[in-house]
């Protein structure tokens, strides 16, 4: 999986969204998705053709798994970025820089109306894992140069600030030696 922001489609979209308000972003993103064949119907033909199965979802995304490719499709509702598509794409770029082995890849948009669409990403499915313990997360983040901050699940290395790094978003191999941060909010300090 490549860095979503370095892929030509995501980068061209980001260039179009710079300087637009979150409300102005939606019609531009939807037009871009239509012109670039990146409209993804997560409840219709797209999902049915791929035999996607509804999978564990969280507050900010609905998830499906593709059993043939071992990819998780994540439809993000933009809740954690205040409806700002560009802000989400920038966060994904930072996340992918920190966690390239479990990177998100931008696929397109699930369009609900002319003024509303949710970005869709894929991420490798990690099998034979369990939720990491708080202790495992702390040890892993410290090994990466991050220090815990005042709030639970928040870490910083002085350059990046990660939040929501909690057991619900971090997986560990059965022996605890491999850690996968499958969901985290990343920003620059």
Protein language model annotation of sequence segments:
Residues 58, 66-67, 112, 173-175:
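Acidic surface patches and DE-rich sequence motifs
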């Amino acid at each position: 999986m490549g860095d979503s922001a370095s892929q030509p489609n995501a980068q061209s979209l980001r260039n179009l969204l710079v300087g637009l308000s979150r409300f102005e972003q939606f019609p531009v993103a939807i037009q871009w998705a239509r012109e670039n064949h990146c409209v993804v119907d997560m409840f219709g033909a797209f999902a049915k053709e791929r035999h996607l199965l509804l999978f564990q979802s969280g507050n900010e995304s609905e998830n499906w798994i593709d059993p043939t490719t071992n990819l998780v499709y994540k439809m993000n509702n933009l809740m954690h970025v205040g409806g700002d598509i560009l802000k989400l794409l920038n966060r994904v770029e930072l996340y992918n820089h920190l966690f390239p082995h479990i990177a998100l890849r931008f696929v397109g948009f699930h369009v609900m109306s002319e003024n509303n669409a949710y970005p869709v990403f894929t991420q490798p499915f990690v099998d034979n894992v369990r939720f990491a313990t708080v202790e495992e997360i702390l040890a892993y983040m410290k090994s990466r140069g991050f220090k815990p901050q005042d709030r639970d699940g928040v870490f910083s290395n002085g350059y990046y600030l990660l939040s929501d790094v909690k057991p619900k978003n971090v997986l560990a191999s059965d022996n605890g030696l491999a850690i996968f941060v499958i969901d985290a909010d990343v920003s620059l300090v």
